[in-house]
């Protein structure tokens, strides 16, 4: 399974997945609006185990997340919003929805410095609520009566993204420390050779150093055996 950014060529397949799985449907131009305005925030899950039949064969998209940044946030805080999330029934319970969500949230922080992300979910959608609340850590902000076209209530939810920013900063500090350590190690050994100057360990040491000289007895005078 491959998670990659949404492409404009994916939009017909996205719309098909939306119509197949969700009661909240959108016109194609609505997806295009997201793709052109915030191209970094929307992702698709592609089943790479399905081989392409020809160069014009479309990839098998089994899930997607469509997201955006709130253009004029009422609270003045930059934040993202999940417009639509869907995974085909044949590929559910594989963690795809979680991966799509986390990838989009990371992009919100890296690209737009988003402080939090919001979404709406149907009160009756138990599976989605479990994903958002239990797996991803979203908190319910408030219920919104008759939010959906069929009259069902929605829950407005929110997830603070400061923890992602801290993770990014920690990774950057770790990479900088690692690079500094490598630089220092290179400068210390530059131009130095272990076989010059003082011996280091066993390298460069005379193997005979420290041993007592061996003594041999050499006979002096006439050999008695030779005079016989």
Kindly give the residue locations of the regions a language model identified.
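Conserved hydrophobic beta-strand within the GNAT/NAT acetyltransferase core sheet
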Residues: 82, 117-121
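Conserved active-site alpha-helix within GNAT-family acetyltransferase domains
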Residues: 98, 110, 115, 123-155
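Acetyl-CoA-dependent GNAT
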Residues: 8-90, 101-112, 160-164, 180-182, ...
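Active-site acidic-Proline motif in GNAT/NAT acetyltransferases
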Residues: 88-90, 94, 123-124
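PTP/DSP superfamily signal
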Residues: 153, 165-166
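Short, charged, solvent-exposed linker or helix-capping segments at domain edges/interfaces
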Residues: 166-176
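Beta-rich interaction modules in large eukaryotic scaffold/regulatory proteins
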Residues: 4-5, 116
């Amino acid at each position: 399974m491959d998670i990659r950014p949404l492409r404009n060529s994916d939009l017909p397949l996205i719309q098909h997945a939306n119509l197949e799985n969700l009661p909240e449907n959108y016109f194609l131009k609505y997806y295009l609006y997201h793709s052109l305005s915030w191209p970094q925030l929307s992702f698709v899950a592609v089943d790479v185990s399905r081989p392409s039949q020809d160069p014009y064969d479309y990839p098998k998209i089994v899930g997607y997340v469509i997201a955006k940044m709130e253009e004029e946030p009422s609270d003045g805080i930059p934040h993202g919003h999940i417009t639509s999330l869907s995974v085909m029934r044949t590929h559910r319970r594989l963690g795809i929805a979680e991966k799509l969500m986390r990838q989009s949230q990371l992009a919100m922080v890296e690209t737009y410095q988003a402080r939090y992300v919001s979404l709406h979910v149907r009160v009756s959608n138990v599976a989605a609520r479990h994903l958002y609340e239990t797996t991803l850590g979203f908190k319910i902000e408030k219920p919104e009566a008759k939010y959906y076209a069929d009259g069902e209530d929605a829950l407005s939810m929110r997830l603070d993204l400061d923890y992602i920013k801290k993770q990014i900063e920690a990774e950057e500090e770790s990479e900088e420390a690692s690079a500094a350590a490598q630089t220092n190690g290179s400068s210390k050994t530059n131009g130095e050779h272990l076989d010059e100057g003082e011996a280091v360990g066993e390298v460069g040491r005379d193997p005979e150093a420290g041993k007592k000289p061996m003594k041999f007895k050499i006979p002096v005078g006439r050999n008695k055996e030779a005079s016989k």
